[in-house]
Amino acid sequence: YNINVMVKKEWIEKGYVDEPIDEILDLKAEIRKLCKEKDAIILAHYYTVGEIQDIADFVGDSLALARKAAETEAKVMVMCGVHFMAETCKLLSPDKIVLCPDLNAGCSLADSCKAEDLKKYKEEHPGYQVVSYVNTTAAVKALTDCVVTSGNAKKVIDSFPQDAKIIFGPDYNLGNYINSVTGRNMLLWNGGCHVHEKFSVEAIIKLKQEHPEAVVMAHLECKAPVLAVADVKGSTATMLHYAQEHPEIKEYIIATEAGILHELERNCPDVIFYPVPPEVSEGGVGCSCNECEYMKMNSLKKIYNSLKFGWPTVEVGPEIAKDAVKPIEKMLSLS
């Protein structure tokens, strides 16, 4: 990349490169061309829009994306997801350029646990180890003994001695589920994902009445009553594998962010997937699916501009990076 590209003040204010693009450009083709020129790969989370998943070199959940980031040969990674995922890429491949198409793509779950609060909590609980969900900032990971994703949380926790004292955060629902299946009593941080917290048992029951044959799949970030009525509980990758491995099932009710429907429908074209609508407050107007507005900040235009101008890049300071990478590497070695 030409390091001399002037990063404009307005880009910094907006958090992304906002430059006009010729309307006649075939953005998908141009993005692939830029990837070739810059030796870049595009990593996309299942919750991004379908057209981004279609042009990505690799689509996956947090665990698969972390693995890919650790092993890629490419000089540049464009992380189409949210900010903590781009940080994870940078931690695992510090010598690579990591682009995040829109720096505003945060995460309500990562925001629910501030490093200074966790540091204080750790000091109040000597003798406890910290296990953090991957949906956390690098600064929180630096205070962590081991990281988990929803795809490997049980496996990682099972590797700790049964009498180990553990603080688990920031996702209360995931921690509560892991406590219930492992018989542990981990101390749980009270954080949550604003998308998964909106799923209700009532909405699932209503869909189940309309589609009695459908199998209910729910993400582990959902509340306990929702998980209690689900037939399949797990990460997005768990849901995808289950649907692929059970061709006899023709209908599913899905309680997770709606972006996963793209990959589910692509892999299982003869199956019908019903997204659970979010719970609406009294008098509110509901929509048919539950979306993460942060994931949806990623767009073809922003990806094109980030590749063209080599910005926004994600950096992690060396002091934090040296401590933050250890718990991620520990997780990868365990899973």
Question: Where on the chain are the PLM-derived regions?
Answer:
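Active-site loop-to-helix "anion-binding N-cap" substructures in soluble metabolic enzymes
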Residues: 5-254, 260-261, 266-335
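Short, positively charged and aromatic/hydrophobic N-terminal segments
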Residues: 1-3
